[in-house]
């Protein structure tokens, strides 16, 4: 049963950090959590080609600080910062409240080490009608060249237009899902093809964050 747990939630507080940083009263918690989800969906829709790997949100009083980690910051910033200004204006119009938004753009120097971007690459290839095995092999080659220690990819659905849906997976290197000190990056996305939706899961092993020796006090 251990491998069925979400690999990021399993490691929260150990090798993974929360993606929303704030405290709220119990009565407001649900509303703010839904607002965080809406902000992320809005930004990913607006910046669909910007190579967004992660969106972190912090709240301080009436201010919402959004950090966007992207492989293509130029597409977001635009000329003279006009892109960020337009994003802030759109956010204020979309979420008509008294909160003030602030956006920080963080550049990712090696996008092939991000499971989110690898999954999106596979989805784009599948939507372009590339054979799923070739798309998986190309993704593994990109991640391996970037220096990842292990990667596992699973694609499920009507593969290559087959009548019966199935799942196929491939792995390169080590992906120790049961080791808590293992730095596992996980992502899931969907590819919308003419035959239906294909689900794509990517696990990446980036090494161990702690020494393998037990620490005793």
UniProtKB/Swiss-Prot annotation:
Main location: plastid
MF-aspect GO terms: rRNA binding; structural constituent of ribosome
Any GO CC annotation of this UniProt entry: cytosolic small ribosomal subunit
Transmembrane segments: none
GO biological process: translation
Ranges for domain KH type-2: 39-109
CDD domains with a match to the protein in the record: KH-II_30S_S3
Cross-referenced PANTHER family: 30S/40S RIBOSOMAL PROTEIN S3 (PTHR11760), SMALL RIBOSOMAL SUBUNIT PROTEIN US3C (PTHR11760:SF19)
Record NCBIfam families: rpsC_bact
Protein name per UniProt: Small ribosomal subunit protein uS3c
The species this protein was found in: Chlorokybus atmophyticus
Gene field: rps3
């Amino acid at each position: 049963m251990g491998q069925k747990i979400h690999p990021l939630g399993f490691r929260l507080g150990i090798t993974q950090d929360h993606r929303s940083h704030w405290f709220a009263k119990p009565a407001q918690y649900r509303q703010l959590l839904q607002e965080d989800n809406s902000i992320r969906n809005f930004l990913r829709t607006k910046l669909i080609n910007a190579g967004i790997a992660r969106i972190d949100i912090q709240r301080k009083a009436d201010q919402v600080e959004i950090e966007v980690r992207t492989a293509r910051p130029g597409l977001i910033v635009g000329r003279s910062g006009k892109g960020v200004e337009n994003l802030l204006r759109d956010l204020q119009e979309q979420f008509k409240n008294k909160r003030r938004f602030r956006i920080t753009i963080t550049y990712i120097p090696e996008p092939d080490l991000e499971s989110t971007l690898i999954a999106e690459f596979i989805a784009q290839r599948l939507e372009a009608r590339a054979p799923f095995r070739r798309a998986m092999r190309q993704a593994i080659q990109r991640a391996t060249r970037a220096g990842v220690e292990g990667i596992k990819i699973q694609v499920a659905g009507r593969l290559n237009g087959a009548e019966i849906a199935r799942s196929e997976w491939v792995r390169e290197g080590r992906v120790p899902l049961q080791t808590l000190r293992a730095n596992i990056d996980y992502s899931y996305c969907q590819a919308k093809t003419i035959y239906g939706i294909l689900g794509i899961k990517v696990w990446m092993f980036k090494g161990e964050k702690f020494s393998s020796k037990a620490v005793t006090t």
